[in-house]
């Protein structure tokens, strides 16, 4: 993946690939395997999915506000804090993956009608130090870039479970 800024098409491709890739990787595993950590200090596949859902919630809501409002002010929320307000870690993997995939389909549908200039829409983000100006492109790119190594993490976990 390029180290610079991703194009809109690259972002959309990466976002579309995540949920089906996770589904393919985890096909055939039983719930106990998906909830088992390969090592004591590591996440299970379910923990990784819960984290991805939390990030999608937080950054997806920022994206929605940026699209809906002109130059809004958004209070930063850490996905690690947000996950504590959910039951994502306790959910069964397959229904959780289905919810994640549905959320992703909905997000991609929101992006579909956007003009290229809409990706430059901004928000001022507060609550994490000095206020920062972030774009729709920034949030979408964070989501896409952040997800990729976690999908690889799920692949490593699954390979361990299948040994």
PLM region spans:
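Extreme N-terminal tail/first-helix region
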Residues: 1-20
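Active-site rim elements
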Residues: 7-11, 92-97, 139-140
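Aromatic-acidic/polar surface patches that form glycan- and anion
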Residues: 11, 15, 41, 100, ...
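Acidic/histidine-rich alpha-helical segments that form the ligand environment
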Residues: 14-18, 83-120
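Amphipathic, well-ordered alpha-helical segments in soluble domains
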Residues: 18-21, 25, 55, 103, ...
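Solvent-exposed, charged/polar functional surfaces in cytosolic regulatory/catalytic domains
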Residues: 21-28, 106-113, 149
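A glycine-rich, hydrophobic loop/mini-helix early in the fold
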Residues: 28-29, 39
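Short, contiguous alpha-helical
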Residues: 35-81, 108, 119-163
